[in-house]
Amino acid sequence: MSHQALGIDLSKVERLSVPNILHFVWIGDLNEVNTHYIDIWEKTNKDKQIFFWYDQNSSLCHLLNNAIRDFVSVKKIKNKVKAELKIKNHAFKYIYPKIKTGFSFDELVIEFLTKHEIPYQRPPKAIEDAWFGNRGFIKKSITELFCNDFDDFMRYYYYEIILRHNIASASDIVRLLIIYQYGGTYIDVDTLPYIDNIYHKLNEYIRKEGIVESDSFLLFKTVCFLKKINSEGGLPEAVIGCDENELGLDAVGFEEIKRLIELDLTDFSLDMILPLGETYVHKNLLALGSLRRFKGVYFNNFISSHQKSKAVRIILRVMKKRYRFLERKNCIFDCYIDDGSRCYLTRRS
């Protein structure tokens, strides 16, 4: 097969085995993480090691952001957005240099808030190492990723955590560093394994009737699965109470679908979920998550590759280049406003 975008004939590219490691990342308070999905991955992929990446000293990133935002919101200030950005700039310039010398982020957060008389909620309780051992996870420190050639990425990581409180972007940095340095498969903590194969009777009915599965329909199938394994805690009532109108069905069709789902799930066990098995990628490339119905659309909630992949290295290099561009244009600490073609430079708080 020839890949036109890359100009590569993939049939001639060597395929390499991916290390048997599943990587999960959590940034923030570990008390808030829901491990239900990770547990499912672990139980259905017993040949894989579970690496749980966690920044032990950054559990107060949410506390810092919320404290500053609440502090500004009660002040009689005309431009609250600008005031919030200014305090966050001070926070970064106070916290980050000290982190570089070995101080704890969490301790510096409390120190900064106290020094500036910014009220904050009680910090969450500390997590013991037993938390990881009891779940069979191998504890890995995010900070170890910022060594040698990757020390600049530590600065970018804290830009996202302190200045923008953009945990998703911080996680993007971390997941790429993990895959490049370790290889294996990165998975978002809110991503399930492929489960559609367990719906034998339902899927046969869908094909027969020519039903197009909407996002609501797919979500309904997932909710039913989660209810079956008693992991539905916290799901919104609107999802659990889904009706035929949301699925684009009439009442009769909806009842039939519920009946078939019940039949499919009657004898369900986790053994029915297909394991990843041995995973291969083309040399120096990577595999990404995708949905069958979205041709050419890929997602970074699932990334798999071997160590030192050139493709991942290129992505990291481009990321570094863009952060440096923003630094040169003074767009890290300033609120850049431009309604023209360069509006992507605008800092988002």
Give residue ranges: language-model regions.
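Small-residue hinge/turn detector
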Residues: 172-184
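Glycosyltransferase-associated regions of secretory-pathway enzymes
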Residues: 1-172, 187-349
